[in-house]
Amino acid sequence: FFKAMGADSAIEIIQNCTYKDYTEVGNSLDATSLDNMLAAIPYMKSINEYRKSVGLSELQVTYKLIAAAIANANYSDVKFGHSMQFDTSENLAWNYGTDPKPQWVDQEKAFFDQAVQELYGVTGLIGKDAADFYKSHSGIESYVNQHFKVAGYPATVGHYLHVISPEIGYMGMAVCSKGTMNGWKTDSFDTANLGWAGSGWNMNPISVDEYE
């Protein structure tokens, strides 16, 4: 696919990134498979629909970020955690093939809203207002860590805040369906900031519809 698109920087990532050995081109369950690349598109649309609903810009897609998400999804299919192999911001989710937005947004927004209300008596924050409030109030994440749990682990609001960041402008998303850990599918959502071109993540952006 990337070869057909002339996306040399994406090919470079797939072939030469730090954890390239976790990617198996030709494996139908690998994040490089066309089926799994197509499977990620509704999830990208879901993210953009939510951002639009709270007054934020929709994210554009770049092939380089898609490639980073592919490499990260394949790595995190095997290792429970972030690969840290790229200078992108990343959300990960493990599930049985469902949209990760409820994990990243719906669940964590509920934690965020409750923490903000209990700590500061504030309600109704969404979008940029929620992101800005978090930046100026340092106690929210630690409160959530201490008072909420997800599958036995301390909860976070970091994935939610990543999705609603006003600073990001570009994304890539990938699904690995090998199910190495507990039969889970692995979703990786990688982003780059608006106006930041240091590593070329924002080169030749297109809309999700154009990508599809």
What positions do the PLM features span?
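A well-ordered secondary-structure block
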Residues: 86-205
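Short, well-ordered surface patches within globular domains
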Residues: 1-90, 101, 160, 166-178
